[in-house]
Amino acid sequence: MRFLVSGGGTGGHIYPALAIARGLKNRYPGAEILYMGTSNGMEADIVPAEGFPFTGISASGLERKLSPRNLLALWQAVRGFCQAVEIIGRWRPEAVIGTGGYVCGPVVLAAVLKRIPTLIHEQNALPGVTNRILSRFASRVAITFADSLKYFPDQSKVRLTGLPVRPEILQADRKTGLQKLGIKEGRFFLLSFGGSRGARSINGAMLTVIKAFAGNPDVEILHATGKAGYQKFLDGCRAAGIELDKIGNVTVKEYIYNMQDALAAADLVVSRAGAATLAELTALGIPSILVPYPYASENHQEFNARALEKEGAALVILDRQLNGGLLSRTITELINDRARLQAMAAASRKMGKNRALEDIIDCIDELIRSKRRHF
C-alpha cells in the first residue's frame, strides 16, 4: 500500500504528519510513505532525517494584504498543483493526508482531482486558512479541539480525534519521573517552559516566582529558559540575589530533553499554548497556567488556551498582562487550593485524546474501505 503525506512551514504541521506516517507504517506493514512538501521549507531537512522519502513542489504563502508577492504565490500554487498532479498520478497512493501549511493546498486538491481519498488534520482550535478551504473538498477532516467544529461547513465529514502524542509521553508515569528528576514524593512540583526556543515574558515572570519560592522545602521548580534566554536568566537571578546553587529547590535549564519525565511528575505547568504542548498536558491530565504566544498566526494560541480554560483545565494569562507578581500569586493560590487543582487535573484528563493516532488511522482506513466498496 502507498500513502502520500503532506504538511509544511512549521514544526506544528510537520511533526503531526510524521506521527501519522509512522502510524500508517505500523497499521499496514510494508506500506510505502511519500512525504510531499516544499524544497525550501523546514520539512526538506526534517523529513529525510526521520527516514521518510521526500519530494518537493513549488508553494508559498499568501500575504494577508494586497502585495505583488501574492501574484508570485498564486503562480507557485498553480505550478505546485501541476507538479502534485503528476507525482500523485505516478505514485498512485491509497490516500493522501494533509496536516496544514500552504503546501497542502495544491497537494490535497490534486488528490481530489485524481479521485483519491483525502484526510486533513487540524491541530489548532482556530483552523488555519488552508484547512478551512480544503475542508470543502477533503473526504474527511480530523480535528484536535471540539471548538474547531463550527468553522467547517460540512460537519458530517468532521471527526474529533485529537492530536497524536509521542509514545514516550503516553508511557511516562509520575513515580518514575520523580525518581529520574530526584524529587521527593509529596513535594509540589512546578514545571515551566516557553517552548523549544523559550519565551522572554515567561522567563521574566519566573524570576519573581523563583524568588518567592526560593528555599521552600515543599515546592520544587524546574524552569527551561530556551537557549537564547539562558545566560540572561542566570544573570537576572544573580541580580535578584537568587543563588541557584544554594537554594536547593530550583533547577534552571536551557532545554528539557527528558520532557516525558518532567511532565509525568508535574503538579502544575506554566507554558505557551501550542497545540502539541496542550495535547501532551491533557494526555497526562496536568493542570496548567497558559500564556499564549501573542504573535502566532491569527492568534491561534489564545483560541487553544481558551478551549482548555472553558473546560476548567487551565487558567489563561495573556502575554501583555503577564508579570511576576500576578504569576506568583496565581501559582500560590493553586498550591493552597488542592481541591481546585485536582478539579483542573480531572478536566484536563477528560480532554485528553490518548488514542488520537489510532483514531486518525481508523479514519484513513475507513476511507480506503469505502473507496474499495465503490469500485
From Swiss-Prot:
Residue numbers binding UDP-N-acetyl-alpha-D-glucosamine: 10-12, 124, 166, 196, 256, 301
UniProt-annotated location(s): Cell membrane
Keywords, ordered alphabetically: Cell cycle, Cell division, Cell membrane, Cell shape, Cell wall biogenesis/degradation, Glycosyltransferase, Membrane, Peptidoglycan synthesis, Transferase
Residue ranges crossing the lipid bilayer per the database entry: none
Recorded topology in the membrane: Peripheral membrane protein
Reaction it catalyzes: di-trans,octa-cis-undecaprenyl diphospho-N-acetyl-alpha-D-muramoyl-L-alanyl-D-glutamyl-meso-2,6-diaminopimeloyl-D-alanyl-D-alanine + UDP-N-acetyl-alpha-D-glucosamine = di-trans,octa-cis-undecaprenyl diphospho-[N-acetyl-alpha-D-glucosaminyl-(1->4)]-N-acetyl-alpha-D-muramoyl-L-alanyl-D-glutamyl-meso-2,6-diaminopimeloyl-D-alanyl-D-alanine + UDP + H(+)
Keyword set includes GTP-binding: no
Pathway: Cell wall biogenesis; peptidoglycan biosynthesis
Enzyme class: transferase
Entry GO CC: plasma membrane
Principal place of residence: membrane
A Pfam family per the record: Glyco_tran_28_C
Biological processes annotated in GO: carbohydrate metabolic process; cell division; cell wall organization; lipid glycosylation; peptidoglycan biosynthetic process; regulation of cell shape
Matches recorded under SUPFAM superfamilies: UDP-Glycosyltransferase/glycogen phosphorylase (SSF53756)
GO molecular function, one term: undecaprenyldiphospho-muramoylpentapeptide beta-N-acetylglucosaminyltransferase activity
Documented EC number(s): 2.4.1.227
Similarity comment text for this entry: Belongs to the glycosyltransferase 28 family. MurG subfamily.
Family matches, as HAMAP family: MurG (MF_00033)
UniProt function note: Cell wall formation. Catalyzes the transfer of a GlcNAc subunit on undecaprenyl-pyrophosphoryl-MurNAc-pentapeptide (lipid intermediate I) to form undecaprenyl-pyrophosphoryl-MurNAc-(pentapeptide)GlcNAc (lipid intermediate II).
Name of the featured protein: UDP-N-acetylglucosamine--N-acetylmuramyl-(pentapeptide) pyrophosphoryl-undecaprenol N-acetylglucosamine transferase
